[in-house]
């Protein structure tokens, strides 16, 4: 048994169906778009944390 009761053979079959439907070039595009979206999200979260700490530094005591 694999993850959540899905066997490795079932996962391979699902992967083969996805590749057959979309093709490898479309999957590469989807993968790179998803990676860039995650990178931009992390960058936005880091800049938000930086802005929050800068605001806290400027508060009078």
From Swiss-Prot:
UniProt record similarity statement: Belongs to the TatA/E family.
Record key words, sorted: Cell inner membrane, Cell membrane, Membrane, Protein transport, Translocation, Transmembrane, Transmembrane helix, Transport
Residue stretches spanning the membrane: 2-22
Protein name as catalogued: Sec-independent protein translocase protein TatA
Compartment(s) of residence: Cell inner membrane
Keyword hit for Coiled coil: no
Species name: Legionella pneumophila (strain Lens)
Domain of life: Bacteria
GO cellular component, as recorded: TAT protein transport complex
Described function: Part of the twin-arginine translocation (Tat) system that transports large folded proteins containing a characteristic twin-arginine motif in their signal peptide across membranes. TatA could form the protein-conducting channel of the Tat system.
Membrane topology type: Single-pass membrane protein
Gene Ontology molecular-function annotations: protein transmembrane transporter activity
InterPro entries: TatA/B/E, TatA/E
Primary residence: membrane
GO biological process: protein transport by the Tat complex
Record keyword Metal-binding present: no
Quaternary context: The Tat system comprises two distinct complexes: a TatABC complex, containing multiple copies of TatA, TatB and TatC subunits, and a separate TatA complex, containing only TatA subunits. Substrates initially bind to the TatABC complex, which probably triggers association of the separate TatA complex to form the active translocon.
PANTHER family associated with the record: SEC-INDEPENDENT PROTEIN TRANSLOCASE PROTEIN TATA
